[in-house]
Every structure is written in structure tokens, then in C-alpha cells.
Amino acid sequence: MNSQVMYHNVPTPPGNVSLAAAAPDGGLLYAGIRCINYISAPPANGEQPQVVTMSTRINILALDVSPMWGLGNGGPTKPFAIVGDDLSVQVWDCALGEAVIGHKAHQHQHEARDVRVVHHTTNSVLMSYLANGNILSMDASDLVIYCVASNTYCRRSTFISPRNHQLTMVRCSPYNDNLFAVGTAMGNVLVCDLRKMNIVYKFHGHKAPICGLAWREVPAAEDEKTNNLALSAEEWRSRNGGQEEKPKTKPPPLTKSKAAESDDPFDIYNFDHLEYEFGAPIAERRRKSSEDCGGEFVGLEKPAGAAVLDFVEACESVKAELLASRQEDKTQHVEVTLHDCEPTKPTGPLSDASTISNKNDASDSTEGSLEVIQYSSSSDDAVIVDGEAAKPKREVLHHIYHQAEVHASGTPQTKSEPQSNLQVVPAISAETISLTSVNSTHLETLLVSIDGDEVMMIWNTNTGAHAGKNYSKSKTAGKLNNVYWLNNHVIVSLSRHQLFFWSVEFERKMLRYKISKDKSHSCHLQDIVSFACDSSKEMIWLCRNNRQIGMMNPKTGRMADFYGTVAFGVRAMAECPDDMNKIALGCSDRRVAFFDISKLTTSCLPIDSVYVSSNVYCLAWSPNCLELAFGTFDGTVGILDVERMKVKTHLRTPHKKEVYSLVWQDHFIYFIVNRVLGFFDLRKSKIEPTIVNCISRPSYLSIRDSFLFVGTDDGLLQIHERDSGMEKSWSPFIRQSALFARYVTDIAWCPLDSNKFAVSGNDRSVYVMEFQPTERNWKTLHTFTANTEKASITSMRWSHTQKHLLLTFHIEGKVCLWNCNAPEKPPLTITYHCPMWCGMFLPTNENIIMCSGKALSVELIDIKDALEGDEKSICPKVDALLNVKWASKSLTQPYAPVLTAAEKKRQRRDQRKAAAKLEVDVANKDQKKIQESVTAVIDNPTNDKCTQETPVEEMLEALSLDKEQNNRSAKECPKCKEQSPDSFTHSRTCLYLTQKELNKSALEKLAIVLTEDSAKIDKSVLISKLFSSKVMAKELIATELTNLKHSNTKDIAPLCLAMSTFKLREELEQHIANKTLTERHVSLAPSVSFTLWQDCCRAYAKQMEEKGYIMHAATYLFSQGMQSEAIKLFLANEYYKEALVHARICLPATDPLIKTVINNWLEHLEGTGNFAAAALICVLDNEMLRGYSYLRKYRNCTPEIADLMDQIKRIGQLGGVLDGCAPNEPIHNGSTAEH
């Protein structure tokens, strides 16, 4: 390893959503899982490589790099923007590694309260940077423009119909502040103008969702041809410039006249006036001109009467005249721009001669410059020169000077007659003509798009024309397809996890670009997840499926740089005993990674990973260092072949819980899972776990020769010894000490002092001890205490070169370096914003600490300067979301909520209903008051007092639509609404249909009865069955019961009718099956049979249990003599007091269910943190040691708690068990105890 190479961060793997972008400085930004990674361009001149990992806490939906990267301008120096899973848009500064500003314009209230409720996709909010550095973000209904400089945003309703277009991609033009392109799920590409808020072009052609868009400005094809012609003419002039010329008289100033007729001697297509201009006859000049220009002649316009012209003298003369004219300032200048010189009928690609780019807007001509116009005839037009054959597409260059008059645009054949035919113009040398023609090229803005079917299309955004297409032969649709421009002539696309290179050439016959496979670039990788192109260097960044990030040279197809990745939350680090440079990492994303520090260079971060079945919690190297054991989250222990990088086998432990401690000694792998210690014997053909039952509640283990050190869940440190002659048997603990209030987390042995070890736990104390093997004892050397009250140490690591240095990693986000030579000195503290899990000293340089945490992959910190400067703390990374300044809404234009047509219609309908209801209520109220006043006058005619009018306040309250209307009829009882559905209601009848006949259709039924038609009477008049036989009365009850069941009546009526028909059993059995029993059903069940009543009680108890009424259910179980079932029901639903009191009364004193209730009650109190109540119950149950252990769990031991612990220790005679480390003689236990 090069000692000068040091990466501060190890990047994380790419996330599930492929988001990557190339920074303007050549670096790579890509999104990981809840983080962003930046890798700088390959360093040069011995510079340090830069890798930055930034935790976002939430998943990322969109990522884009600002065009202002590296400019600063008083804001972030390296800004980029993301869209979080909570729909917030955040602007980050890569130089600071934190979010700076942002806005939450796309958030709704319920989403802002809890992000976990709604799971957004990448199409929820689309975001891209505009060319001016502002941010455009879009969702289904709104379009938000975020001004980064002022930290304000403006939200408008989108002009893209969400009903017709489901957006999948947005890319703003890097060449225009107002243009952006969006792709839809239907395969449309929309080019939109932000200033005009409309769709400029709508491109059709794709049949699958758009997956990628890329902009590019390229020179127009006709301009390239013109530049080639100008260069050829200049070369021809340089070859003939040495010929002698005759002295020439000073010619008159150059003039610009109107276009001449075809027979005019100054016609631009008449070349006779150019005789001897370059020292050659006319015929020879025509021949050479045709040869040099490929059959297309470039002519120069000449003034009248000048057969030969000395350009040098003309330039000097005109220069003097220009100086004189500027001094006099008499000439009125007319500015001519490129826009004024546009060709009227262009050929080549379907585009303007100009572009709407802001860059071209700034390239307007200035005084004294030379502008070039390109005239091109169509394929049907032809130009005849001196009677020769027609030559199609002849291009002619005109001199356009700034004092020339601007003619109105028209066809090349149309001539406009200005008021002044002649204007004086300055003359410029031929060299200036050629240079100006090269520099004034026209640019076309092309947009390439790719869909899910790998079909690419090129669009000309200047004219809205389709400019090219390739056809895919693949039938597989992919969502990871993407496209970039590598340069002006090469496009690179991603599909099927492969890169494809396409050459782009303009075809003049088809007036389109031809897309074909490019053979000069190649890439043979087939595991690419995402990529980004650095167009300035023509290099490609690749994010691969094997969790490596690399930069590839497309010309050679080889990886120039590659970087391994590690996910957040590395839970274990273990260096190989034979090769300390090889470090194994237990990752939280089902991987085991290997970091080979010896191969670390400026262009290589060597990390290889292997996929395993679950998250890895602990690691252990085999004695021969060829295999690695790992414990996982789901209770399995795997064995990995390091050389082949493959998992050999998976061993299942007795529990499906995390394996949080692992040791490999000889042929045995020891593990702890779910407070159980066991081991695997690898010599057996069928490997099964063996449980060690003599060790209770272990939390961590360490083996030293024949001694087993065990840290328990109660904070005790125990030592066990292997029985003589037995490899699998361990004696009960020989020695134990109470060190912590809670579980032991780590036991670390010093590599330079074989008997020194440190013990840490879920507490703020660290004990450094010395083991005495001959005496089977230990003694405390030092005790380090963290200054944080609620500290908890997750792991420790000793130095390999200095035996007095110890590293501890804390759950509150600290890494402390302790010095055993100066135990009273405060440690060097490295502060982070997340819990820290593990770490170590870098084997090659112990001035560098390598650590990992919950929101940290692997970070390397150099502490050399801090140690030399005697610093107390280092803060390498702060909370990235701590100092975000959220934007406010812009007040330039008020915001009105955007409603769709359906929502507006629904709102108007609700308003009409509310208004109509209000009118009815007011009318009823007025009518009621009139009736009351009339009644009062009638009852008391002598009272002449007028009724009071309605107060104005009451009328205004009635008009308020915001207030909830409390409409209740006069006959309505408010107490009835408060009653539960099962409460008794006063009912006047159970024959509702018969009552209806009497009240509403008595006359009609009477008419039927008077017809004396018995069949019609029996069919239509129910009340007639009351005056008939018993059979007819039963039919009446059956009809009424059917009606009651259909109407779901819950009163006593169905039971009352069933009692008379002797069908109560059927009624109750039906209610049991439907789980709709009530107490009245249970009360009536004994009238049928005792067995049915028992069934009803059990069914009703089960029904109440399902509804959550545990007390009701237990009561009915007790009534059936099912005491054990009722107590278990109380216990299962955490009714511990009720369960215990009934168990004391109903069960024998020796019943194990009583002890089960007490134990479950204690575990519940421990889980809720009520240690005082747990200790009280333990003392009452005569479990003094357990009560003492509960009081020790208090982190802040007050004098009151300490006094209670002393009393429990005294009463329970626990001095021999809880003696700590003070006695010199060990205290024995079990069969080896001394009496």
C-alpha cells in the first residue's frame, strides 16, 4: 500500500433507483441507499483521491448536478440537488457534505407528517437544473421553479395535462434558460417553454415509456461544409500568394450595391471580372477553383470598374477612411446581426440557420466585423454559370459589412430595391474572411431520447423535426435504459445492463442523421447498473452490479479506475490473523466484504464482496485462515471459502434470532443466539448444534485456551473451564463479577499482552483487567468512564503496536481513544451523528482509525495531527440535515390552489347544497317562531308584548359555511345518539309490516277484504292472518322475521317472534355461526337446553375476545368452569394483576401457571423500564437476587436506590454472590465449591 494514499470515505453501492450524474470537474455523483456518493476525477500530480459519502436519511427519487458547479458566486461551491422520498427538493454542497437549502412545495400535509405511509416512486416528482442554475421540479399537478440565489420558489399549475401525459423523465436544456424536455409513459417527447408556459414541440415515434433524454449542441452540417470550403480557398491563396503583381492604383472605396441581373457584368455568377485576380487566366482559374472546391465555386463580390484589385492597398486605404469617418462621426452605422443574415431557404438538416440558444444570442455582430451568409438552393433549383451546365446546390459567400443595408427576408431569387443602392463599406482582407467564416458556425440543438424498447430517436429542437432513429432488434423491455452524448458524433446508451456506442452521421440525401453501430468505441461488461459520461474527457463512469464503481476509457474498453463499495451499517470487522492487511467486513445488506489494504492506490479501492443469506452481525476466522464463519440476522451460521469467495455451508441454530457472538476454536464454532450458548462440531458428517445448558442468559463469549469467558445479559462476567479430558463439557462458573447494569457487549484481548483484556457493556464504563490463569481469577487495572450519562459501548479494539491504546465505539455516536498509561486523562473523542458499531486501527498506519456506523459505510480518520496538538475532540462529519434553510414561497404572484374540472364541479355542487339547506333551515326556524308566537297569543290574548326579533349575530352565524351545521329535528333525543348500538331501545311493535298496513294503507286493504276473494286476501293483506288459523299466524311471523333479517334490526323483535314459533335453536345457531351473538341471546339459551347455553357462552366469549373485550370474554369462561383458559386469556393480553389474583384463588399453590404469570409480568415491567415495580414484585416473591439485578439496571443510581440495594443484599444474604472484584480469593460455585 502507498502510505500517502488515504480515502476518507468508502463509497456505498448504488441504490435500487439508478441515479448517476457526471460533475463538471470530471467526478461522479450517484445515489446509494439513503445516501449520496461523490468520487472525484482521477487525481493527477500526486493529489489525494476524494470520496465523499453523504447520508440523506431518506431514499432518493431524483438527482442532478448544477451547471454552477465550481463557480461559487457566494453560494455553494459544488452544488447539486436531490428529491427525497418525502417529496422535498434539497440543494446540497458537496464541498461541505451537507444540505444547504431546499423547499417542500410538493409535500402534502399527511405526507409531511409521516413519510412511511406513502411510498413514492421516481415519477412522483421530476427534477432538473435549468441552464441559469435554478431548479425545475414537476409533479402530476404542479410545476415549481426554485430560485437558488434567493431561496424562494414559485408554484404554478402545470400546462401538461396529467390525464393525457404521465411524465417519466425531465431534462432541462443546458443551452437555454427556458427550454426543457419531458418524456411520457406513452412514448411522447414534449419540448416546453418555461417562459411562455406552453408546449413548443410534441414528438411522436416511441411506443414505450421514455427512459432517457440528452441534449447536445452540434455544428450544422451545412456550416461544416462551408468551413471546409473557406479553408480550401485560404490554402489556395497561400499557395499563390508569392507571385509578383503589377503596381496598382488606389481603387475607390468598396461599395455594396443591389443584386445584379444575370446579364449584369457584376453578376455574382459571372466570373469574367475576376481575370488575373490571383495571377491566373480565367480558364485556368475556373479549372483550379472547381478542383479545390469540389465543383462548387466560392465567389467574392467585386466593385464596378475594378478589373484587378490589390487587397493590401485597399485595406490600408479603407482603414484610413474608417479612422477619419469615426472621428467625424458623420456616418450613421447600421448594425447587422446573425439573425438578420439568416438564409431564407436552407437545406441540410431541418433547422434554422440560427439557434435559440442564449450563447448564440450573445454572439451578435459588432462594428467592424464580417458576417457570412450562406445561400443554398434546393435540389430542384440550379444555377447556370456562363452558359455551362446547371450545377445543383451551388453555395456562394457574400461579403456583408456593417454599414450595408439590411434587406427584407425573401427567397434568394427575389430582389428588394432599397432607397439607397450604394453604401460605403470597409474592406477586409481575405484572411479575415476565412477566419470569420470558420468562427461564425451555426449550432443545432439536438435532443436524443430512448425508450423501454431500446429505440433511440434524435429530434431537432430548433425546428421541431425528426432527425434520426435506430431500430432495436431486442424484444426485452427494460427500465434502466439511458442515453448520453459522448461527443458530437457518438452516442452511448445503456440497455440490458450493457453499453452500446452509436455513431451519428448526417445524410444529405435524407436530410437526417444516420445512427449506426460505432466500432471505434467498445465496452464488454454486462453487469452495468447505471453510467454517466464526462464529455470533456470522453470518459465514462460505470456503476456495476458487482458493487464496484469505475471509470472506463471507451476507446480501449478498459477500466482505468475502480472503487469497491460497502453499505451503511457494517456490524463487524475482523482482520485475518495471517495477513493483517486483509480485513473482513460484515455488512448489513447481506454481504461479506473483504478489504485488501495492501492493494490500495490512488486509482483503486480494492473491496470484494460475497452475497450471503442475511445481514451479518459477527465474524470469526478459522484457525488456518482459509475460511471465515459469519453469524446472521436470521439465526444461521455460514462458512465462507475465502480463496474461492463462495459460501460452503449454512448451519442452522435453534432460534431464528440474530447471532451476536461467534468464536472459532479448533474444530468447534461457538455461538450465542437468543440468550443461548451452543457450538457446532465440524468433524461430524451431519452438523447439528449442541446447547450448553449450564450457562444462563449469555450475551458475549470469548475463549482463551481452556477458559471460557462469558458476559451475561444481566451485566455479569463469568469464567468457565473445560472439563479435563472432555472437549464439549464446561464446568459451572468458577468466578463471576457484577460489572454492568445491563448486558455485556464485548470482551477484547490485548494482542501485545496476552493476559490483559477489556470488558464493555450497555453502560458508560470500560473495565481493563488482568487475567491470572494459575489462580483462575482477574483483577481490575483501570476503569474508564464516558462523560455521557446515557452511554453504551458497542465494541472495542486494542492497538497492535502500542499496548496502552484502546479504542471504544459508542452507541451515541462517539469513538474514544483511551490511554492506559494516563487513565485520568480524558480520551480523544471523534464525534459522529449516528450510532457507531465497530472499527479498528489501520494495520499499516495506526495514526488512521477505520470505523463504521449506522449511517456510515467505512470512514478513515487521521488522528496524527490531533495527537500531536493534544486535541480533545474531532468532528469529521456533522449531521447533513441540521442546517437546512427551507425556502419560502415567492410573494411576487399570489398562489391559488389548482383544482381540476371535476373538483371545481364538485365544489360548486357542495356550495349549492349548503345554500339550499341553509334556506330550508332558516325557513323552518322562522315558521317555528311564527307558530310559537301565534300559540302564545291564543293562550294569552291579554299579552300585548311583541315577539323578539332574531338577533343579527345569530343570522350571521347561520350564514357561515365554515361552521358545521347542527341540524336536529325537534322530536330527536340527543341522548339516544349517545347510546351504543347494543343498548336497549323502546319498541312499540315487532310486527312492522302489519303495523305499516294499519297506518298507511288501511283503506286499500279494506277494499281488498271487501272483495271477499280469499286468495287475494291471503296474498295481499297480512293482518288478515291474525284472524285466521294457527298455521296462518306462523306464516305471518315467518314473513315478519324475513323482513327483520333483511333490515338488520338489532332490537328484541326477532327473538320475541322466534320464541312463539319454537325456532329459537335455529335462530341462536345461526347467530353463533355469524358471530353476532348478544347478551340477550345468551340469556335465552337455557330455555332450549343447557348444552346450547354452554355453546352460546363459549361462542360469545370467543366473539368478545376477537373484538377486544377481554374482561367480558373471561367472565363467560369463568361461568363455564374454564378457569385455566380464562387465566391464560388474561395473560396473553397482559392482564397480569387479574390473571394472578384469579390464579391464586382458583389454582393450587404449586401450579406452574402462577410462576408463569409472575415471570411474564416481570418481563413486561422490564421492557417498559419500570424497574422499581419489578424489584418490588421480586422481593415479594422472595427472589432477592433478581430484585437486586433490576435495581442495578438504573443508569443513574440515586442514594435512595443504593440504600434499597444494600438492604436487599443484606436481607437476601447476597454478599457471597455480589462481591464484585474486591476479594483476592475466588468464590466457587457448584460441584467445585469449598465448604
UniProtKB/Swiss-Prot annotation:
Compositional bias annotation for Basic and acidic residues: 234-248, 963-980
SMART domains registered for this protein in UniProt: WD40
GO cellular component, one term: nucleus
InterPro entries: Beta-prop_GEMI5_1st (IPR056432), Beta-prop_GEMI5_2nd (IPR056424), Gemin-5 (IPR052640), TPR_GEMI5 (IPR056421), WD40/YVTN_repeat-like_dom_sf (IPR015943), WD40_repeat_dom_sf (IPR036322), WD40_rpt (IPR001680)
Annotated stretches, region: Disordered: 227-263, 340-368, 963-983
Regions of compositional bias (Polar residues) in chain numbering: 352-368
Residue stretches spanning the membrane: none
Signal peptide: none
GO molecular function: mRNA 3'-UTR binding
Ranges: WD repeats: 55-102, 428-469, 475-512, 565-605, 611-650, 690-730, 739-779, 788-828
Locus of motif LXXLL motif: 443-447
Origin superkingdom: Eukaryota
GO process annotations (BP): adult locomotory behavior; flight behavior; molting cycle, chitin-based cuticle; response to ecdysone; spliceosomal snRNP assembly
Consequence of gene loss (knockout): Late larval lethal associated with molting defects at the 3rd instar stage. RNAi-mediated knockdown is late larval to adult lethal; the phenotype is the same if knockdown is restricted to muscle tissue, neuronal tissue or motor neuron cells. Conditional RNAi-mediated knockdown in the central nervous system or muscle tissue of adults results in age-dependent decline of motor functions, including climbing ability and flight.
Subunit structure: Component of the core survival motor neuron (SMN) complex composed of Smn, Gem2, Gem3, rig/Gem5 and one of 3 almost identical Gem4 paralogs encoded by Glos/Gem4a, Gem4b or Gem4c. Interacts with nuclear receptors EcR, svp (seven up), usp (ultraspiracle), Hr39 and Hr3.
Domain notes: Contains one Leu-Xaa-Xaa-Leu-Leu (LXXLL) motif, which is usually essential for the association with nuclear receptors.
Protein name: Gem-associated protein 5
Origin species: Drosophila melanogaster
